[in-house]
């Protein structure tokens, strides 16, 4: 009799020796899929669960006469200009399931943004890395939004706790109450993002309203969950750094007895990924957040009795 097939999850990266994603030295697992579409997103390749392709012009050897991908795309998504440079029709490419261009490329110019793992395969990676953590570390599930693959994640979490692996999550909390509560039963530490307190402004820049997000955070804060919760705010000048929004965040935290927040200054490190996905990056001209302004925001939280960490300087 054949054994039951294991659940598979789609993962776009696994990083060992992460020191900014929770207490101690950790393995961070990046799961595909996200209900948000933040205009500043550093990991836009994570938005869909299904595999899709990225193209790096810097890795492509078209200028050296390489033609290995010519004629490989049977769907007509791939053509070439007079300089031999690949030209991609992303409207066709997004529905591809065969990825002949990826399979043909010697130089990783075409690459997939998702790799399937079974539960046991991923747990084996985590257990292997646990030799590096010893008692100080664990695994952090990030994304994308890891809760979108909640059935797979739940099975992995159960196996992690069987071998006493500390579990953390980085989440938008933008999932149903049922899914959120089920997963958090097996979470020891959490970063949860608050992009903006105003629901309309939140939707304008992320594609979704924030009602469900705030509801899940409130429910968690007022439950008997005994893990550690740190809110995170990606600080973006002109979007969510106003006195009004900061005051609203503080009021929300006081109302729910939340005591820790992490301010992450905006960066453009993911811009090249947008180009590789054929997407327009609207934040290319957005300036960095002034360090002095970040210190002012930090002082406001501290003056209101909230532990506030800036960037990767956290109390771990």
UniProtKB/Swiss-Prot annotation:
Reaction(s) catalysed by this chain's protein: glycyl-[protein] + reduced [flavodoxin] + S-adenosyl-L-methionine = glycin-2-yl radical-[protein] + semiquinone [flavodoxin] + 5'-deoxyadenosine + L-methionine + H(+)
Binding site for S-adenosyl-L-methionine: 40-42, 144, 193-195, 267
Keywords: 4Fe-4S, Iron, Iron-sulfur, Metal-binding, Oxidoreductase, S-adenosyl-L-methionine
Family annotation (PROSITE patterns): 4FE4S_FER_2, RADICAL_ACTIVATING, RADICAL_SAM
Residue span(s) of domain Radical SAM core: 20-307
The keyword rRNA-binding appears for this protein: no
Gene3D superfamilies: Aldolase class I
Cofactor(s) listed: [4Fe-4S] cluster
Residues engaged in binding [4Fe-4S] cluster 1: 34, 38, 41
Record has Acyltransferase as a keyword: no
EC number assigned by the record: 1.97.1.-
Family: Belongs to the organic radical-activating enzymes family.
Protein function: Catalyzes activation of 4-hydroxyphenylacetate decarboxylase under anaerobic conditions by generation of an organic free radical on a glycine residue, via a homolytic cleavage of S-adenosyl-L-methionine (SAM).
PANTHER family found in the cross-reference section: PYRUVATE FORMATE-LYASE 2-ACTIVATING ENZYME, PYRUVATE FORMATE-LYASE-ACTIVATING ENZYME
Protein name, UniProt field: 4-hydroxyphenylacetate decarboxylase activating enzyme
Organism the protein comes from: Clostridioides difficile (Peptoclostridium difficile)
């Amino acid at each position: 009799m054949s054994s039951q097939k294991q659940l598979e999850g789609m993962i776009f990266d696994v990083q060992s020796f992460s020191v900014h994603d929770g207490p101690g030295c950790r393995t961070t697992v990046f799961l595909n899929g996200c209900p948000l579409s933040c205009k500043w997103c550093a990991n836009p390749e994570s938005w869909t669960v299904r595999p899709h392709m990225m193209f790096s012009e810097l890795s492509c050897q078209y200028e050296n006469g390489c033609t290995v991908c010519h004629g490989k795309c049977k769907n007509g998504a791939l053509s070439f200009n007079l300089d031999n440079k690949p030209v991609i029709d992303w409207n066709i490419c997004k529905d591809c399931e065969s990825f002949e261009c990826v399979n043909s490329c010697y130089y990783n110019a075409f690459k997939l943004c998702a790799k399937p793992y079974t539960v046991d395969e991923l747990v084996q990676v985590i257990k292997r890395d646990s030799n590096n953590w010893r008692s100080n570390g664990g695994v952090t599930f990030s994304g994308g939004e890891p809760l979108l693959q909640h059935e797979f994640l739940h099975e992995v979490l159960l196996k992690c706790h069987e071998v006493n692996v500390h579990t953390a999550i980085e989440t938008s909390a933008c999932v149903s109450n049922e899914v959120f509560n089920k997963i958090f039963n097996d979470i020891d530490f959490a970063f949860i993002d608050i992009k903006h307190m105003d629901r309309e402004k939140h939707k304008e820049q992320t594609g979704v309203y924030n009602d469900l997000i705030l509801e899940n955070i409130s429910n968690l804060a007022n439950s008997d969950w005994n893990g550690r919760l740190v809110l995170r705010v990606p600080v973006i000048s002109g979007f969510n750094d106003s006195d009004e929004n900061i005051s609203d965040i503080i009021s929300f935290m006081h109302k729910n007895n939340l005591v820790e927040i992490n301010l992450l200054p905006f960066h453009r490190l993911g811009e090249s990924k947008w180009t590789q996905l054929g997407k327009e990056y609207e934040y290319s001209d957005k300036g960095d957040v002034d360090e002095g302004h970040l210190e002012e925001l930090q002082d406001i939280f501290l003056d209101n009795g909230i532990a506030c960490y800036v960037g990767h300087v956290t109390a771990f």
